[in-house]
Amino acid sequence: MAFPEKVDYVIVGAGIHGLSTAWHLAAKLKAKGKGDGSKIVVIDKDSIAAGASGIACGVVRNNYYQPAMRELMAMCVEVWESDAKNFHYHDVGYMQISPECMESDVAEIYAQQKNIGYDSVFIQGKKDSENYMKKMFGDWQAQGITSVLHEKRGGYANNTSAIYGLADKAEALGVKILTGTTVTGFEFGSNSNAVTGVQTDKGTIKCEQVIVGAGPWIKSFWDMLELPN
């Protein structure tokens, strides 16, 4: 693949943030008749899913206390479900099995799930919880359980394979992915602080916009961009 000299969008990071952005942006450009993924380049200093995206737990759930997070995760679950094969996603559901001290908080999570129409079941009481679990696991023996929140949707994904699947979807829309390419700095407009290019160890890519999806490496880019501490 020839090294690109100019594109509209440079995305830094080939993990879930960068590749998801590339895929959705390419799809949006195509839908609006403004081009396709050929306007987008993703660069990464290492390889696809080489960072946190490749080693996270892989759990897909909607079990969060913040209402805004719950609505966001409901949409995310829909994305996972949209192409389970390529995302290496297993829709086995998710369960929170809790002692009495957590029951009221879990009950609130359940109530908010119901408010947004998220498919889940909430079992309360020691005996009912035990019976519910034994219907699925005949050898269930855990003690001190007073509630079970069973999310019928959700599950888990095989991390690295899922990210490669995401890369395939982005590339299918024309996105170019350059791995083993390290960002060394940025170019700025002569009359403004706008970024006009991304400097790498393989050359400079002129661009209109830069999206940094580098996860825990964001600090180094923050410094390169001379943003306030």
Regions found by a protein language model. Give the residues of each.
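Eukaryotic N-terminal low-complexity, Ser/Thr- and Lys/Arg-rich leader segments
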Residues: 1-8, 191, 196-197
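Beta1/beta-strand and adjacent pyrophosphate-binding region of the FAD-binding site
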Residues: 2-17, 41
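Conserved Rossmann-like nucleotide-cofactor binding loop
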Residues: 17, 48, 217
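Short, well-ordered alpha-helices that flank and scaffold nucleotide-derived cofactor binding pockets
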Residues: 23, 27, 31, 164, ...
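Glycine-rich FAD pyrophosphate-binding loop
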Residues: 26-53
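Dinucleotide-binding Rossmann-like beta1-alpha1 core, especially the glycine-rich loop
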Residues: 57-136, 145
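Helical element adjacent to the flavin cofactor pocket in flavoenzyme catalytic cores
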Residues: 149-209, 213-220
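Glycine-rich beta-alpha-beta "Rossmann" dinucleotide-binding loop(s) and their flanking helix/strand
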Residues: 220-229
